[in-house]
Amino acid sequence: MSSNAKWLNKVKWDEHGLVPVIAQEVGSNDVLMFAWMNRDALAKTIESGEAIYWSRSRKKLWHKGEESGHTQKVHEVRLDCDEDVVLLKVEQVGAIACHTGRHSCFFQKFEGDAKEGDWETVEPVLKNPETIYK
């Protein structure tokens, strides 16, 4: 599949050629993570049926789970009303989406009020990240 496919032109890419992506678990509707895609990543995601993102730090395509085995099988791809955010409905293989070894990257919850509040960890580590990554 070409990253010049007509359907890719509908996406409003930012000035760096990227679009924000939210990965949501298809069964539970849990928000698992936030990442970025370029045209190539989105085209390869559609083609392969697994989530492939763009790593801004490494400046390369990143097949989610390539090291850990915690891949994301894509069930749906949606584009928001402004056409500038992509939602992936995924099946998270191995139940771990976060590099910290947790189910979701959104494991910190704000508790309290504006003056005395703080971020609390509300999800357990399911697997030690040192044993996940080589």
Swiss-Prot record:
One of its GO terms (molecular function) is zinc ion binding. It catalyses: 1-(5-phospho-beta-D-ribosyl)-5'-AMP + H2O = 1-(5-phospho-beta-D-ribosyl)-5-[(5-phospho-beta-D-ribosylamino)methylideneamino]imidazole-4-carboxamide. It holds the Pfam family PRA-CH. GO terms for biological process: L-histidine biosynthetic process. It comes from the Bacteria. Disulfide bonds: none annotated. It is an enzyme of class 3 (hydrolase). One of its GO terms (cellular component) is cytoplasm. Keywords: Amino-acid biosynthesis, Cytoplasm, Histidine biosynthesis, Hydrolase, Magnesium, Metal-binding, Zinc. Zn(2+) binds at C81, C98, C105. Coiled coil: none annotated. Binds 1 Mg(2+) ion per subunit. Binds 1 zinc ion per subunit. Mg(2+) binds at D80, D82, D84. Its EC number is 3.5.4.19. Pathway: Amino-acid biosynthesis; L-histidine biosynthesis; L-histidine from 5-phospho-alpha-D-ribose 1-diphosphate: step 3/9. Belongs to the PRA-CH family. Catalyzes the hydrolysis of the adenine ring of phosphoribosyl-AMP. Homodimer. This is Phosphoribosyl-AMP cyclohydrolase. It comes from Herminiimonas arsenicoxydans. The lineage of its organism: Bacteria, Pseudomonadati, Pseudomonadota, Betaproteobacteria, Burkholderiales. The gene is hisI.
